[in-house]
Amino acid sequence: MIRALAVVALLICCRPGVCAAPSALLYMTESPESVHSFLAHADKIDLLVPTWYHVDENGLVTGAPNPLVMATAKQHGVPVMPILALFHKKHFHDLSLNPAAQERMNEAMVREAKLHGYTGFQFDFENVDWIDRDGLTAVVKRSAQALHQAGFQLTIATVPNAPGYPTGDGFSKWIFTDWRGAYDLAELAKAVDLICLMTYDQQTRWTTPGPVAGWQWTIENLDYALAVVPKEKLSLGIPLYGYHWFTGAPNVDKVTGVESPNPSANYISAPDAQLLATTYKAPIQWDATDRTAWFFFYRDQMREWIFFTDLRTFRERYQLTQDRGLQGFCSWVLGNEDPAIWDFLPKKH
């Protein structure tokens, strides 16, 4: 009887999405810290997405792989799918209206994938105007068709956009029109092999202090995406970094000499955040509502705030991908992570 119950418990535990390890997609830049992190932990990564390529408004693709990274990926059996990035609003608009430029872009992606053994490419098109929503969808569909016909995959990173419209004027309107409004998740999901939902940068240098990816905000954006994207095609963004808010020196108008406030914020890695906490003897606290690590300290008699991803913050969002049965998680960016995360993640190769 005991053995039978154990077997039943094992079967329940191992239903897909309950105890299966989510697919681990990690982004990598060309910074030494990022490359070193991949070289040290390649055996725990399912898919490497490096920031090697860019495209301009004429469809000209520029970039090249890192040979050491490619050799290490091959040694460990890690598939490589580089980003193809474009962050310029007008340049993307021009590209979306130019079929010949899109054809050049698609031909270049197929050429590079064949030449270097990539599994495909990931589009990272940001700062796209909301009026180019249909244009973005059309570009993605054409590129997906071209890559699929050649035997390669196309994925896309999308800015989280719940509830799908601005909830007010000011910041809400700006972030919708300039960042969130261009992604038609339902249509994009029909074309691509995977959507990486960038559920991070809730608070940034543009905002007051707060979590990089608060729990309720993450849930709202995940639920919004899951309403139109199959869970097997959705990867949850988990940030590996944080932000550091502080008071900057006043801005001074060069003409009038008038001073204005300068609240400032910088991007910060988890190890650097932990170093500041140690340096200023600041206890790292846990925000039970937003389920994230944070702390504050005083320097020059002024309070400074840091919200960042430690192991607990990461682990709770990793568990969320399991609970929802998602394809996996996607984390920006290697080299910024709490080192303890690697003891938690399972070996894949």
Map each language-model feature to its residues.
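Sec-dependent N-terminal signal peptides
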Residues: 4-13
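Glycan-recognition patch characteristic of GH18 chitinases/ENGases
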Residues: 21-109
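A cross-domain feature marking catalytic cores of carbohydrate-active enzymes
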Residues: 28, 52, 82-86, 125-127, ...
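Short, acidic/polar
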Residues: 28-42, 98-114, 176-188, 309-322
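Conserved, mostly hydrophobic/aromatic
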Residues: 48, 123, 195, 236, ...
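Substrate-binding surface in catalytic domains of secreted glycosidases
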Residues: 57-60, 129-275
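The substrate-binding groove and active-site-proximal loops of carbohydrate-active enzymes
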Residues: 93-99, 125-133, 206-213, 304-307
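Glycan-binding loop/region signatures in secreted carbohydrate-active enzymes
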Residues: 240-319, 341, 349
